Amino acid sequence: MNIKNFSVELEFAVNDKPAKLVLESRSAIEGYEDENLKLVCLVDDSCDTHTLRIIVTSKKPLKMKSAQIVHDHFFGKREQFFANGYQSWTTSREYKRGDTQYGLRGPSKLPFARKIAGVSGDYHFTVYGRELFHSFTYTYLRNDSKVELFGSLNERTGYTIFYADMKTNVFVITKDVEGLTIDGEYELFNTVHTIGTYDAVFDRYFEAYPLKHTGRVDHFAGYTSWYNYFQNIDEKIILRDLEGLKRAGDAANIFQIDDGYETYVGDWDLDTKKFPNGMASIVDKIHAAGYKAGLWLAPFAAEFKANIVKEHPEWLIKNEKGKNQFSGIAWNGFYALDIEQQEVRDYIKAYFDKVFDDWGFDMVKLDFLYAACINPRNGKTRGQLMCEAMDFLRECCRDKIILGCGVPLGPSFGIVDACRISCDVELSFKERYYTKVTNQEIISAKMAMNNSIFRRHLNGRIMANDPDVFFLRDDGMKPAKFTMEQKKLLAKINHMFGSVLFVSDDIGAYDDEKMQILLDSYKEFDGKVISAEYVSHDEIEIVYEKDGKRHTLKFNTLTGANSEK
C-alpha cells in the first residue's frame, strides 16, 4: 500500500456549526490552512519503517466528531486482516473475505442487555458489519508470508482504530475523538507502516514504539487461586496449595492470591475471618518457599455493596445522565472510581502502599482496568483517560511487577510487565450456550487459545504474555470438564505461546503423569513458531521448529482433537 496515496477527512463543529474538511494526500502533505485550522502532514518513507503524522492546530475551538485517513485497497481473496481486540479479553484473530467479526450477538443486542453485555467492549463506539473488520492500536495485512503492518505510536490522543472494509475495498485509519475539543496544537495521528516477514515487522514496530518492554518479567510459572476456588479462598486453602506448589521446585517462581481475600471490592479491607493471621505472614511463607508473592486487585472497581459506594458516591464516575456509571457484572455489578479526583487517587495509592509496604507483595495483578475509560469525560478521549490511568497505576506500583488484565493493550505497552492477552478460560472445554449470544470478552477455552496464538507477536517484545491458566486436576472445588487430551492441548498452547504459566490446582494431589506435564509446561519454550493460521472454520495449524526439526500441530478448536507430525 502506498502510504502517500490517501485522503484525510475531518468532521467537527465550530461555534456549534458543523464543518467538514477533505484533503487528498498531496494537499495534506503540502500543508493546509483556513480560518478554522492549520493542518500539517509529515510523511517519511526513507527507511524500512515509514511514518505518518498529522498535526492540527486550531484557530478556534474545534469540537471533533470524526477523524480518519482513507486508503483505497483491493483485498485479495486470501489476504488476511488482523483484528486486535479492544482489550485483554476481546477476540483477536485474522479475518479474510467471507469471515465475520462478531460483535454483540442475539439477546445481548437488546437495549437493557446491551448495557450489561457491552460495557467491557467497544460496541458503543465502533462499527460492525458484513466483511467489515476493525483493529485497535495496530494491525497487519498478510498475504502468505508477506506482512504489511500499520501501528500507532500514540494512543494518548485517542484510540487509533484500523478498519478493513472488504465490500468497498477501503482501508481506513480512524481516531476515536469522541469528547475531544481541539484548542491549540493536537497530534491526531502518529503511525508507522512497514512490510516484511511476520517477525520482522513486529520487531520494527516495537523498535519504533516510544515505550519499551520493562524487562522485569521474562518468564513466570506458578499458581493462582482463582480457577479452582474463585472467591471461596481462605488461609488454610492458600497455605495448603503453597505447600503443594513446592513439588515443582525451582520450576516455579510465583504464587498469586486472587480475588476473595477482601471484604468488598473497592474497600480492600482484609477479611479476617478467612485470613485470621493477616497477609504479611502468608507473604513471608511464600518468600520462604522461594517464590515471588502476587496479589489480585481491581483498583478502579467498587462493587455495589462496597462501603465506599455509600460513603463516597461523589468518588464514582458518572454517566451522561449524572448517574453512577455501570461498569460490569462482576460481584453482581460494580461502578468505577474517578481518578480525575485527587481524593480518589490518594485513596487508591494508600491501599497500594499497604499491599507493598505492610503486606510485602512483589507483584499485583490489576484487573477490570477498562472501567477507567468506558466513556470520554472532562474533555478527554477514551485513549487519553486510559493512558493516564495506566501512568497512575505505574506511579502507585513504583518498580513492583504489574500483571495487567481486562485492559486495552495499547495504553498498557511499556507500563505493565506482563499482561493477559486472552479471555478467561472456561472450566469446560466445550463452549457453553452463552458464548454465542453475548459479547466477545466472554470466558472460553477456545478463544483463550485463539488469542494466545494470534497475539503471540507481543510476547517478549513489549510484555510477557499471560494466556490464562491451564488445568490438570480431575477434582477440586470447581472440577474442570476437560478430557486429558484437551488438558494437554491447552497446556501445550500456553507453553508455546505464553510467558506467564499458571495453574489453580492443588499440585500436592497430582499423580506422577500430571506432575511431569506440569514441569514440562512450566519450562520456557525453546522452539520457534514459523506460522499459525486457521486452515478451516474450526481448525488451526501451527508450524514450528524445535531441536532442529520442523513440526506441524493441527487441532480442532471445538473438540480439542489434535495431531502432530
Model regions and ranges:
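Aromatic-lined carbohydrate-binding/catalytic grooves of carbohydrate-active enzymes
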Residues: H219-Y223, Y227-D353, W359-N378
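Aromatic-lined carbohydrate-recognition surfaces of secreted/lumenal glycan-active proteins
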Residues: S225-Y227, Q256, Y291-F304, M386-C419, ...
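Flexible loop/turn segments at secondary-structure boundaries
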Residues: Y229-I233, E262-V265, F300-K305, A371-N375, ...
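Glycan-recognition surfaces
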Residues: K310-D346, R394-A509
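Short glycine/threonine-rich loop-to-helix capping motif typified by GTGT followed
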Residues: P376-G383, V416-D417
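Carbohydrate-binding surface patches
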Residues: K488-L490, N494-F502, E533-K565
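Amphipathic alpha-helical
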Residues: L518-I530
